[in-house]
Structures are given as structure tokens and as C-alpha cells.
Swiss-Prot record:
Entry superkingdom: Bacteria
Broad EC category: translocase
Organism in which the protein naturally occurs: Synechococcus sp. (strain CC9902)
Residue ranges of domain ABC transporter in the record: 18-257
Protein name as catalogued: Phosphate import ATP-binding protein PstB
InterPro entries linked to this entry: AAA+_ATPase, ABC_transporter-like_ATP-bd, ABC_transporter-like_CS, P-loop_NTPase, PstB-like
GO cellular component annotations of the record: plasma membrane
Gene: pstB
Role, per record: Part of the ABC transporter complex PstSACB involved in phosphate import. Responsible for energy coupling to the transport system.
Length: 272
């Protein structure tokens, strides 16, 4: 290998945050999503789209091993992060979840003060810096500081739904992850709150890699740089369906010039 090709290979590797290699995830004996090859680019927003039941949320949760908490859920294949297989026996799943944070569909603040919602995760992860500065910085990055700065001792549950979701984003940021996963983070929010979350995501990608699952195709167009479209097919002798990756490309290509007919049908609203 020449130095030029070696440098190019290293540069390519540095641009990939997460690499999913032939990933199949099953619940019991039934596969939920199969044979996925997918590389998530560093410093970009990647959207997973597709009809209900195609396995996109299951796949998202596999990136930080949240599926480990589901009895009977197994993964075959490899999920690489910084060149390390996250499912290797030597890997600590707690550390995985610190470095790859998660924001859920429903806002779920802790029953603690706004300040403690942000500080708690950092504290239990051994943060020894200035906690006040970390809390303020995290709330600012999540675009909720101005709404919270004068009531940091109030309960996080006293905030509006949109504010709670941005608080949850701040809580995730405070643990200093490298990747943030978002599972339909705006589905329970009103349009104004959704817009604020989307604006926040544009700022966050300057510091974090983001992967978002969304049923809202317009949202995928607005916020993402790259999009993966998943579909599902029936399985012989089974009542359910199994998801699979149809097409993965930059977002403009997926929505304006898709390579697969199924992608064209989905983004044009013919099914979903």
C-alpha cells in the first residue's frame, strides 16, 4: 500500500463514526431487521426513514446497546465505533451509552431540578470539572438556557413538552458523548417546539454526530445530511415482517433522485 492510499484509507476511517456490518437483530427466533450494511458519517445528521415495522428504531438502539435491556434480543454482525466492535465481550455497555447518548420519543426528565437533570449523569460518570459551567454550557447547546436560567432549582417536569425534550438533550450533552441518537424526538411535540428542536440539531452537528429516526419525511429533508430508507417484507411461515435497508445516500439524492423504485414510491407518498 502506498502512503497516499494509506492516508486516504485513514481519512475515510476518520470520517466514519459508526460502521454497521451485516447486522441482523432478532427478538427470539424472529428477525426484526436483517443484513444491514451502513456507515454513519462523523459530524453529520443521518436520518433513518421508512414505514412502521421496518426496524429503524431497533437498529438505532443497537448503536448504543439499548437493546441489551430487552430479553431475547440478539444481534449478529458487527457494529464498529472508533474501529472497536461495540458487541465485543470486553466492551462495557455503560461506557458505550456514555459515548453514544440517546434522546427518546417522549420527553423523560428525571423527577429532579432542572440543574440536577443536567448534572446528574455527568456526576455519576465521574465529571470533576466546574459543574455550574457544564450545566450552563449544556443548556445553551440545547437552546434552552434562556428559558431555564432563572429557575434552575425548579423541577424539570414543570417545563413544557418542548422544553423538557431540550432539557433531555442537554442532559445527554452533559455526559460529553461523541454521537447522539434521537428516536422520533419531535413526534410528541407541537410545530413550534419541533422547529426549535430542529434548529438545535443544526447547531449540535457542529460538535456531535447525530442519528435520527423520523416518520416525518419533511423533517428528514430539513435536518439531515444523509438518509437511510428502510422497508419491510413478509416472511414465509411467519405472521410478522422483517426490515431491511433499501437505499442509503445523501438526503438530496434520496428525495430527488432515488436509485430504487421502493424509495421513490415511499418519498412520493405512495405507501408508508
Amino acid at each position: 500500500m502506498t502512503k497516499e492510499s494509506a492516508d486516504k484509507q485513514q481519512s475515510t476511517a476518520e470520517n466514519i463514526a459508526v460502521s454497521m456490518q451485516n447486522v441482523t437483530i432478532s427478538y427470539g427466533k424472529s428477525a426484526a431487521v436483517k443484513d444491514v450494511f451502513c456507515e454513519i458519517s462523523t459530524g453529520k445528521v443521518t436520518a433513518f426513514i421508512g414505514p412502521s415495522g421496518c426496524g429503524k428504531s431497533t437498529l438505532l438502539r443497537s448503536i448504543n446497546r439499548m437493546n441489551d435491556l430487552i430479553e431475547g434480543c440478539t444481534l449478529k454482525g458487527r457494529v464498529l465505533f472508533d474501529g472497536v466492535d461495540l458487541y465485543d465481550a470486553a466492551v462495557d455497555p455503560v461506557e458505550v451509552r456514555r459515548r453514544i447518548g440517546m434522546v427518546f420519543q417522549q420527553p423523560n426528565p428525571f423527577p429532579k431540578s432542572i440543574y440536577e437533570n443536567v448534572a446528574f449523569g455527568a456526576r455519576i460518570n465521574g465529571y470533576t470539572g466546574n459543574m455550574d459551567e457544564l450545566v450552563e454550557r449544556s443548556l445553551r447547546q440545547a437552546a434552552v438556557w434562556d428559558e431555564c436560567k432563572d429557575k434552575l432549582k425548579d423541577s424539570g417536569c414543570s417545563l413544557s413538552g418542548g422544553q423538557q425534550q431540550r432539557l433531555c438533550i442537554a442532559r445527554t450533552i452533559a455526559t460529553q458523548p461523541e454521537v447522539i441518537l434521537m428516536d422520533e424526538p419531535c413526534s410528541a411535540l407541537d410545530p413550534i417546539s419541533t422547529l426549535k428542536i430542529e434548529e438545535t440539531m443544526h447547531e449540535l452537528k457542529k460538535s456531535f454526530t447525530i442519528v435520527i429516526v423520523t416518520h416525518n419525511m419533511q423533517q428528514a429533508v430539513r435536518v439531515s445530511d444523509e438518509t437511510a430508507f428502510f422497508n419491510a417484507e413478509t416472511v414465509e411461515n411467519r405472521s410478522g415482517k422483517v426490515g431491511y435497508l433499501v437505499e442509503f445516500n445523501d438526503t438530496q439524492s434520496i428525495f430527488n433522485s432515488p436509485q430504487q423504485q421502493a424509495t421513490q414510491d415511499y418519498v412520493s407518498g405512495r405507501f408508508g
